[in-house]
Amino acid sequence: MIRQSTLKNFAIKRCFQHIAYRNTPAMRSVALAQRFYSSSSRYYSASPLPASKRPEPAPSFNVDPLEQPAEPSKLAKKLRAEPDMDTSFVGLTGGQIFNEMMSRQNVDTVFGYPGGAILPVYDAIHNSDKFNFVLPKHEQGAGHMAEGYARASGKPGVVLVTSGPGATNVVTPMADAFADGIPMVVFTGQVPTSAIGTDAFQEADVVGISRSCTKWNVMVKSVEELPLRINEAFEIATSGRPGPVLVDLPKDVTAAILRNPIPTKTTLPSNALNQLTSRAQDEFVMQSINKAADLINLAKKPVLYVGAGILNHADGPRLLKELSDRAQIPVTTTLQGLGSFDQEDPKSLDMLGMHGCATANLAVQNADLIIAVGARFDDRVTGNISKFAPEARRAAAEGRGGIIHFEVSPKNINKVVQTQIAVEGDATTNLGKMMSKIFPVKERSEWFAQINKWKKEYPYAYMEETPGSKIKPQTVIKKLSKVANDTGRHVIVTTGVGQHQMWAAQHWTWRNPHTFITSGGLGTMGYGLPAAIGAQVAKPESLVIDIDGDASFNMTLTELSSAVQAGTPVKILILNNEEQGMVTQWQSLFYEHRYSHTHQLNPDFIKLAEAMGLKGLRVKKQEELDAKLKEFVSTKGPVLLEVEVDKKVPVLPMVAGGSGLDEFINFDPEVERQQTELRHKRTGGKH
């Protein structure tokens, strides 16, 4: 009994032990530990090819650890001493092995830009029929394309670039993917191993540089270990909370020829699970699930707060709706969670946070129980932490509510907000396990009466157009949402970063998962266009629209010709107010209208589009808008539509820094008129 208890406790300890990704001797443990934190069925996982030598998982995983194993047979001893060897790579260069490994990982698209240090790989994939290759104009574009592809397809985005500046140019996309939990595998060229540390031409310590913005990174030291490192990269990128990984490929490694067979287990994708530890984890998690169900059944004013984690599993949105319907719980989502819950459902509260719906913010502040699913309580959602969820904190102190956190990444639990119950592991899987324990609720009349009152009192509002006035950007979004959805096609929207991003989140009607692709955690301007190209590659039959602002679009506008070259019929909408709108909004509110370097000179976007092979459209007047929007979405190839919109239009509601979620600035026409007069006075009529 003592031995059994000890083994069990050891398994539980191992289950939740944090293993540093940078600890090279623990590389095999990293991949294993990642699998402990999530289910064996996850939406982002690449489908492995079946092993031909023996079943997976190995039979030994099902053996009781206390049971004395039978004496191995002579054949078993021989197999143990002589592991299965893969001869299929013998005689191939590292570049050719890379090509084959992409096939084994079911990669169908690679985004990249060639260069000297990575030429052995590019030579090997010349005319390759194993995957589609998309060439950007800049390596940053390749990274954001891979992000858009991953978000739309559920598969990891793959990037292949050269050393030095080629590698450093993908640091921003990796940091972006790391912040938003997007699976991405980046392969970078490197100078030959003999030249490392000599300041050779285009040498950069990309492993060191990318350490803080990847889940894991590695430099491949020999051609023999190349297949293993590629397999580890895909496994780690798609396990637990998805994210970017980097594999650095020295030129002599990719040019080298493999002379001897290597173990088969290093050349085939692995899907083995440690069943002993999984059983120990399941027991611990079920205790948390039971406690969570008890609190949900007790709650009077619960709210579901849902992030992008619910989208990591194909069944996530379905189970979310089932829980909401079963217990009559209203649902609010983060920016990245938009689309996971149908906004036309009366239980939808829309988005919460700094520029979220006032109803959602008020509901969170007044809820006695907050059920966080696949969300991480970032600062744009919580506002001032000391003022966050006061009613839930009061209910927690009285033992009748609080905060429940369904989260796959242990580091996100209790990082920002103290939770009463943490359910660690794949959020969707654990929701499924909890469902039968939730009591059906017919109605929550008092709670929804209050919510519906807030909805009527605080709708998204803005100063609408008057005859002859400039077009309001919010109007463009609302009209485009209807026109696009009326086509009957599957619609995907990407955005850049700025006011246009928030207006898209607020005024588009989000009904389906994986239809809103944007940069949330890092807030990367220029994200929209390349992400749209990647999404279109992943979903060629979908209507893909990039809603962009002029300042954000300027960051990566060179990718217009990439859209043409890739044959992607993306639709690019530019809301042109000739300013860095989100920054000028803050300058108006908090810096007495001192617009320091926030107005840029734009190119002629229509001539630019036409020069790069796209159709260009422009709208200046209100009466032109409807017809141009219809022409925009019905155009067969790539098209750019520029709409000249009103300037100095604020995104509201807004929760200012240091404020609680219920202390928002809401639209007031009289206040806006006063602000306009004050702005004219302070800027001498210039703005």
From Swiss-Prot:
Its cofactor is Mg(2+); thiamine diphosphate. Residues 499-579 are annotated as: Thiamine pyrophosphate binding. Mg(2+) binds at D550, N577, E579. The keyword Metal-binding applies. Pathway: Amino-acid biosynthesis; L-isoleucine biosynthesis; L-isoleucine from 2-oxobutanoate: step 1/4; Amino-acid biosynthesis; L-valine biosynthesis; L-valine from pyruvate: step 1/4. Its EC number is 2.2.1.6. Thiamine diphosphate binds at E139. Contains 1 molecule of FAD per monomer. The role of this cofactor is not clear considering that the reaction does not involve redox chemistry. Catalytic subunit of mitochondrial acetolactate synthase, which catalyzes the first of a series of common steps in the biosynthesis of the branched-chain amino acids. Catalyzes the irreversible decarboxylation of pyruvate to a bound hydroxyethyl group that then condenses with either a second pyruvate molecule to form 2-acetolactate (AL) or with 2-ketobutyrate to form 2-aceto-2-hydroxybutyrate (AHB). The first product is the precursor for valine and leucine biosynthesis, while the second leads to isoleucine. Belongs to the TPP enzyme family. This is Acetolactate synthase catalytic subunit, mitochondrial.
